[in-house]
Amino acid sequence: MRRLLGCILLIPMLLQAQQHGSCPLDHYLEEVYENPLYEAWLSKYDVTFYHLSLEVSNMDTYLDGFTSIHVVVAETIDSLLFQLNSELQVSAIEVNDAPASGWRHGDDQLVIPALASTGDHLAVKVHYQGDAGRDRGFFAGITSAYDNTNQQWVTYTLSEPLNARDWFPVKQVLTDKADSVWVDLIVDKELMAGSNGILEEIEDVGGGKHKFKWRSRYPIAYYLVSLAVADYRDYSFQAALSGPGDSVLVQNYIYDDDEYFNRWKSRIDDTGEMITLFSNLVIDYPFAREKYGHAVAPMGGGMEHQTMTTIAAFSFTLVAHELAHQWFGDNITCGNWQDIWINEGFASYFEYVALQNLVSQEEADNWMMYAQLLSFEETGSVYVPAEEAENVNRVFDYGLSYKKGAALIHMIRYELNNDALFYEMLRIYSERYTDSLATAVQFREVLEEVSGMDFSCFFDQWYYGTGYPRFNLVAEEMNDTLYVQSLQEPSTTGTPLFRMHFDLLISTSEGNDTVRLCQEMNEQVFAIPVSGEVYDIRFDPENHLLAKSYAELKLAGGREYAIGPNPFNDRMLLRFRNLAGGEEVKIWNLEGKLVMHTTVTSNPSELNLEGLIDGPYVMVLTGPFGEVRETIFKIGKN
């Protein structure tokens, strides 16, 4: 049973230290990072199409080929700027099929003379070769690595956040999604090459090589364009969508090794169940006309390249995370890197959703407890401050952007208190911003529109603010009323008060009851009607909240102890007013046989009585208060 006691202050505590006031979001929203290249160069045209044609090896990161870029001019220009690593050598450039001259390439910038007016269409073709992936570490745009476990060489890309320039000329601006992308990859015939979209053809180009022609006709952010080259095999199947008979191709490029396939097949197959689940909970898989899939690479995790994730191994939560990005990150991309939560927070939370629906609630709860544990160690905000927007380690902070971001969404679900409404909100959000971008502000607008609730304080505290609350609860029962004094202290000074609901589980001699209370000040007292003798209270019993707590129950009527539930199934809770240490518990059956004898070391203490048969027993408690007897009853589970 759950009772909602609203956001009502039942007994005000007039204390000097109380915190009141509004939740000023504007203070945070003014601090927006601006790319210095954007206003001068990158805002003057829109990219509509990329066509990459590259010869690639799985043994190194050397590239040879061209990239064509189609743009529409947004305002009159005399030149175009693309971003391209200076380690790559540009050999020729054409603009609208005519050779270009006077272009400059340095400081990772390629400037091409091109006189054009607003609305003009330009097709720029850049021929280049070279190696920009050497000694760049994890965040190199292109990497060649040896998988020691599986004895495989793999070349793969990882362009997020600003490394696409390491392997093709590009406009690295999140707000400019290309309408489509073609990727042609020429590799040795014993190799395969994966990329975005549908594989339309494998063409024999002679010389012991063949060309993989990938075509994607969905809008795509620059950093989601990808390639992966290795000695692969294709393992494909269909995954059901939400509609009867609807499905999507799941195409996996895995190492061409029987032992590898047998080891991972069942985990790869989990992908199909997850696609069906997410499609039913939110909207259908966003790129269903093409595919979803994986390309294996020794990258220490995964990267959600649109329609074909690059992945190191098929662990359940990693597969769920990268798949969820197809909805949250690829279909809807964060509008700026400061709002990376739009990508990583949601993908992380859908790890929990997958566990909850496809494994067990217990596994999901364990996942959330670990996410909260990592979040407790952080002092920053989920929102990335403007001064940190170019710090890749801050943008992708695991405790903040991923784990605290997921815990935040879990609390939104709790505040809505209605799972159907939660997923309806995600459906509307996904439909509204499909093939586009969104910020946290835009997500909050949808959340408030669908729920009819005001989440401004919530975002001020949990998204833009820092830290978490600590609750200290002291409860005492008097005259059928449980008085709960709740003192909230922040973990950081950045957020002095978290206005929030919390559940309180109250266990009495007549059963359990959960009430939902609302903390509006740092210190409050709640008066809660109860029936029966209270023997235990628990803060946030289902672990919805990113909060630490301590709860103390003062026993009613001067009693030295309380027990419950009674009757019990397998376990009983024992609480002393003051635990001196050394208190003893003995339980006798009606035949006079001692069936349990233990010394109490914790307060409260849980007694495991599952070995007892159903029926009455006599419990004898011994301590500084003397010796007392209670009749207890075990009943079987219904």
Predicted regions mapped to residue ranges:
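Beta-strand-rich binding/interaction modules
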Residues: 90-94, 471, 476-520, 526-538, ...
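N-terminal, polar/Ser/Thr-rich
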Residues: 18-64, 149-151, 455-457, 461
